[in-house]
């Protein structure tokens, strides 16, 4: 039995609120149960130096957690003077995932920076960030098209992400913190709206997992991501 009484395949209630802030070209509050992340997309003309003159754009991401997003306060990374390895890993994951769904040539020499700020953490912050960031990205691209900065839609497809794992010997989807911290296997999966895999991060925390369990976890992730994409589409419509 899961602590929340959810079935193994059941995700937490998922909410996506668009236009959550006033200034960003795209802004979304995404909620996976008690995990809440603010995702903003900022569109700027021009690209990093390494891409100048190549006729293509760039999408990148930054990730951070507010000091009291967790049970006890943690120092801001800015106050410590450097980002943790975890933060760097997560923001690179978010950036890679988002670049997979954008036609960089159609974006032109423009840059979109996605900022994912965790307001409240209860497991799955990186997968919630990717899910919300995709919707914020869509809004930023639509803003640029409306302004005539880009001519065609660079979005190739929607993407979403979910955590899956083995908890007390059972494969489950969308782990909350109490499950994540005790899981035998923890995995983050990013997929397209049609179920193609963009990235898998999987670790055996307590017990090695079998090939059969891997396939079961990927099946759980695929079904959950299909449901999450439906939430994205409903928000965008």
Curated annotation (Swiss-Prot):
It is an enzyme of class 2 (transferase). GO terms for molecular function: 3'-5'-RNA exonuclease activity; tRNA binding; tRNA nucleotidyltransferase activity. GO terms for biological process: rRNA catabolic process; rRNA processing; tRNA processing. SUPFAM superfamilies: Ribonuclease PH domain 2-like, Ribosomal protein S5 domain 2-like. InterPro entries: ExoRNase_PH_dom1, ExoRNase_PH_dom2, ExoRNase_PH_dom2_sf, PNPase/RNase_PH_dom_sf, Ribosomal_Su5_D2-typ_SF, RNase_PH, RNase_PH_bac-type, RNase_PH_CS. Phosphate binds at residues 86, 124-126. It comes from the Bacteria. It holds the Pfam family RNase_PH. The keyword Nucleotidyltransferase applies. It catalyses: tRNA(n+1) + phosphate = tRNA(n) + a ribonucleoside 5'-diphosphate. Its EC number is 2.7.7.56. Keywords: Nucleotidyltransferase, RNA-binding, rRNA processing, Transferase, tRNA processing, tRNA-binding. The keyword rRNA processing applies. Homohexameric ring arranged as a trimer of dimers. Phosphorolytic 3'-5' exoribonuclease that plays an important role in tRNA 3'-end maturation. Removes nucleotide residues following the 3'-CCA terminus of tRNAs; can also add nucleotides to the ends of RNA molecules by using nucleoside diphosphates as substrates, but this may not be physiologically important. Probably plays a role in initiation of 16S rRNA degradation (leading to ribosome degradation) during starvation. PANTHER family: EXOSOME COMPLEX COMPONENT, EXOSOME COMPLEX COMPONENT RRP41. Belongs to the RNase PH family. This is Ribonuclease PH. It comes from Shewanella sp. (strain W3-18-1).
């Amino acid at each position: 039995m899961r602590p929340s009484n959810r079935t193994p395949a059941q995700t937490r209630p998922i909410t996506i609120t668009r236009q959550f802030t006033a200034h960003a070209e795209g802004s979304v509050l995404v909620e996976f149960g008690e995990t809440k992340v603010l995702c903003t997309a900022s569109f700027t003309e021009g690209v990093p130096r390494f891409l100048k003159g190549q006729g293509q754009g760039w999408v990148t991401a930054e990730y951070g957690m507010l000091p009291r997003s967790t049970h006890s306060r943690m120092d801001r990374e800015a106050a410590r003077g450097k980002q943790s390895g975890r933060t760097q890993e997560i923001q690179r994951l978010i950036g890679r995932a988002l670049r997979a769904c954008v036609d960089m040539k159609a974006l032109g020499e423009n840059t979109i920076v996605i900022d994912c700020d965790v307001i409240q953490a209860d497991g799955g912050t990186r997968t919630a960030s990717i899910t919300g960031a995709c919707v914020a990205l869509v809004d930023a691209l639509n803003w640029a098209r409306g302004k005539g900065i880009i001519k065609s839609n660079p979005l190739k497809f929607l993407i979403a992400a979910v955590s899956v794992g083995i908890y007390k010997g059972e494969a489950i989807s969308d782990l909350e913190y109490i499950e994540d911290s005790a899981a035998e296997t923890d995995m983050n999966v990013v997929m397209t709206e049609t179920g193609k895999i963009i990235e898998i991060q999987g670790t055996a925390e307590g017990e090695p997992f079998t090939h059969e369990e891997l396939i079961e976890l990927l099946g759980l992730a695929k079904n959950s991501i299909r449901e999450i994409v439906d939430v994205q589409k409903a928000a965008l419509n």
